[in-house]
Regions:
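Phosphate-interaction motifs
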Residues: 2-167
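Solvent-exposed alpha-helices and their adjacent loops that cap or buttress functional pockets
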Residues: 57-59, 68-69, 87-91, 104-105, ...
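Short acidic loop-to-helix transition motifs that present clustered carboxylates
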Residues: 82-83, 217-225, 270-275
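Flexible glycine/proline-rich
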Residues: 256-403
């Protein structure tokens, strides 16, 4: 039996993570969020439009409103329609001055821009325009009864625009997770090694809309690891540990999770970062995510597998770039996350001997690279299951897409 036979594919791990999240969210308390503080909030209600938006046909340019089917010249009515106006009814053969954003009079269906208008003796020379030119039609943005958001969606600042247009000032959201972040490792606990993972993970968790607390460290002692996780699960919704997730003599986190709850998976076919674990801790109605200790591997696997637990979605936004060097891969059956830096349209594999960080020649070495803090300078990551050829176009997930 291969050492890798018990690993699960990336997509399977993400599916299990999201399923665990959905079950967990069913019992989450709810709160109210104002539109000026939406980023990262998780919506707890469906949002359905109550009225058409816009509520009437509106002009998108300053100019003259008229009916496209009328023959010219068109008599200009001695009025002007503003956004706050109640427009008059136009008779056949008439036009009216109108401001951007103003409602069109009844019968009017077209607007001629002011700078394109020809006026003679109080009449608008009939412009050659298609029906609907420079008109924002009623309901073209939102139709009454249309569902625009579904409970569980993660909101951003951009959503405030549409929600405000719908007349909302607040929305119902789920309370963010309280997250306890615990570093494991005797060398960290005794101050001999710097904890590189916890600040990064706390920053990620905040960018995902939740409330992390750094809870210190614990040495590589099985009972103490279990007791600390148990203690934190009483106070937090989610416990995130770093280090101790492999199967070495001093890796106790998985044993602790087994003793305290139900491990949903352990080890994913991703390099770097494969020894991640997700567990449910039913005695405390909490979840635990165990992240491997090497910093770049920790970042990659947290962004790919842990992120969906907190956001409900997957990082899918990519940029297309040209890879500058051949990159060979190790064992088959893995998704490799290859860090790259950008220069114009090119993506240089960070870690390749021709890059500023030279840790491998022809074959990608996730083990060494995962420990390299210089790899934190990456602009993005290429996810691939096949070797890369210099000159090929590749999809890159920018690091901003993980946040």
């Amino acid at each position: 039996m291969s050492d890798y036979d018990d690993l699960i594919p990336l997509e399977d791990a993400v599916d299990r993570t999201i399923a665990c999240r959905n079950a967990f969210f069913d019992a989450r308390p709810k709160t109210t969020a104002s539109l000026d503080d939406l980023s990262g909030e998780i919506l707890a209600e469906d949002v359905i439009a109550e009225v058409d938006q816009p509520s009437s046909d509106r002009a998108t340019m300053d100019g003259y409103a008229f009916t496209a089917a009328d023959e010219g010249p068109l008599e200009i009515v001695d009025e002007r329609v503003f956004p706050e106006s109640t427009p008059p009814t136009l008779e056949s053969g008439q036009a009216i001055a109108i401001a951007t954003g103003a409602p069109l009079p009844e019968r009017a269906d077209t607007v001629c821009k002011r700078e394109d208008a020809t006026i003679e003796d109080g009449h608008l020379m009939r412009p050659t325009l298609e029906t609907g030119t420079y008109v924002y039609e009623r309901g073209s943005n939102v139709t009454a009864g249309e569902q625009l958001y579904e409970a569980g969606e993660r909101l951003s600042a951009l959503d405030a625009i549409l929600l405000r247009d719908l007349g909302r000032e607040t929305v119902e959201t789920y309370e963010p997770f309280s997250v306890g972040v615990l570093a494991t490792g005797t060398e960290i606990h005794e101050g001999r090694h710097t904890d590189l993972d916890s600040p990064m993970l706390c920053s990620l968790l905040r960018s995902w809309g939740h409330e992390p607390t750094y809870e210190g460290s614990v040495p590589d002692e099985g009972r103490r690891v279990e007791d600390r996780i148990d203690e934190l699960a009483k106070r937090h919704d989610v416990v995130v540990t770093t280090g101790g997730t492999s199967v070495g003599a001093k890796d106790y986190v998985l044993d602790a999770l087994d003793a305290l709850g139900e491990v949903r998976f352990h080890r994913v076919r991703v390099r770097p970062g494969k020894p991640i674990a997700l567990a449910r801790l039913p005695d405390h109605d909490a979840l635990a995510v165990a992240i491997p200790g090497k910093p770049i591997g920790a970042y990659v696997i947290a962004a790919l597998v842990a992120r969906p637990l907190f956001t409900g979605d997957r990082p899918t936004a990519t940029l297309e770039r040209t890879i500058t060097h051949d990159v060979g891969l190790g064992p088959e059956g893995f998704t490799y996350a290859i860090p790259v830096t950008f220069e114009g349209d090119d993506a240089t594999p960070l870690g390749h001997v021709e890059s500023p960080l030279a840790v491998y020649d022809e074959t990608f070495d996730p083990s060494v690279l995962s420990s390299s803090t210089r790899a934190a300078a990456a602009d993005g990551f290429v996810l691939t299951t096949a070797p890369l050829e210099a000159g090929a176009r590749v999809d890159v997930i920018p690091t901003s897409g993980f946040e």
